[in-house]
Amino acid sequence: MQRKECVAMLLAGGQGSRLGVLTKKLAKPAVPFGGRYRIIDFTLSNCNNSGFDTVGVLTQYQPLALNTYIGIGSHWDLDRKNGGVTVLPPFVKEMGGEWYKGTANAIYQNIEFVDQYKPKYILILSGDHIYKMDYSLMLDFHKEKQADATIAVIEVPWQEASGFGIMNTAKDARIVEFEEKPKVPRSNLASMGVYIFNWELLKAYLEEDERNPRSSNDFGKNIIPLMLEAGQRMFAYPFKGYWRDVGTIESLWQANMDLLLENPKLDLNDQKWRIYSVTPHQPPQYVAPSARVNCSLINEGCMVFGNVYHSILFPGVDIGKGSTIRESVILSNVKIGKNVIVERAIVGVETIIEDNCHIGCKENSCPEDCSRITVVEGNIIVPTGSFIKKDCQLVGKAG
């Protein structure tokens, strides 16, 4: 096996329970985003664009759709004879096996996979964030600082800092303290869930952590505090670009809406840093003469006879006459009948919304009444004349 300087390990087994019905049958990294992508596309594309050609993808919760989607990695130019993408679910060894117990345990269980490439460094990534980042620049920073570990950080609003792992740093960016979701944060430098470690050193810490029966087997709760306590050289790598944790319905909806700004901070048209995906084969979209479309993304295979304002339509969506879609995300192959109103909502794949339905905010509601997002599960039928109020999750019948 050809030696690799750095191996990337992408943690993609999370359930994303705060996304409700959107992750009922999908792992969080497989959730659709931006009209034609899935969340994991951003991390995989970052790897390719950064020149990292060996990526292990660790899956666990509802892995079928994600495994099928990734395949051999060809859509991200990661189908290589030496390296490329390898999907790594939990497995059974001679001495038994178990589910991944935490982020650190997931890497521990795949030490043999990493070791076969004899890397000097390991890049650990989360598969459930939306951002574009050149990991090679972070690796250069890691080498320049002669670091044992480097953690990518971004400044977050102070009122949100308690929801993240927070770094306190010296003037030279060396990390002097790490707090996991502190109640009263002393800094607003949040961990992005992107780490570079010297592999042999990390491996020793993973093995030590595994021997501790009281450990949560987690990087934020266990590995990073242990390394700090031991005085290892740990540095914070500042990231200035767009980054969003889409772990809630509201944050996922907002990240989609961010794409519709006149000058979006996340530019999907950047030819120098393309985001790759598995693209469905659909005919061109059609917008009828009577339709009105404003500030929206309309994808292949869509048939629009109604009105679409500030919304994103995934491939194969039909919008009937007299219907209005406003500030919403409509996933693939949804069929919306006539005289339907959908406002500030996310509608799941292949759902049918029959005529005269109203989903989300009522017209002329005050902004405070429309601050929460309505979600409709995929593969269900919403009967004629239904009213689904704001801040609801509409779930189909079991079975």
Curated annotation (Swiss-Prot):
Entry's EC annotation: 2.7.7.27
Keyword terms, alphabetized: ATP-binding, Carbohydrate metabolism, Glycogen biosynthesis, Glycogen metabolism, Nucleotide-binding, Nucleotidyltransferase, Transferase
Pathway: Glycan biosynthesis; glycogen biosynthesis
Residues engaged in binding alpha-D-glucose 1-phosphate: 100, 165, 180-181, 191
Signal peptide: none
Gene3D superfamilies: Hexapeptide repeat proteins, Spore Coat Polysaccharide Biosynthesis Protein SpsA, Chain A
Swiss-Prot/TrEMBL catalytic activity: alpha-D-glucose 1-phosphate + ATP + H(+) = ADP-alpha-D-glucose + diphosphate
One GO BP: glycogen biosynthetic process
Gene Ontology molecular functions: ATP binding; glucose-1-phosphate adenylyltransferase activity
Record-linked HAMAP family: GlgC
Quaternary context: Homotetramer.
Functional description taken from the UniProt entry: Involved in the biosynthesis of ADP-glucose, a building block required for the elongation reactions to produce glycogen. Catalyzes the reaction between ATP and alpha-D-glucose 1-phosphate (G1P) to produce pyrophosphate and ADP-Glc.
Alphabetical list of NCBIfam families matching this protein: glgC, PRK05293.1
Family affiliation: Belongs to the bacterial/plant glucose-1-phosphate adenylyltransferase family.
Protein name: Glucose-1-phosphate adenylyltransferase
Natural source organism: Desulforamulus reducens (strain ATCC BAA-1160 / DSM 100696 / MI-1) (Desulfotomaculum reducens)
The encoding gene: glgC
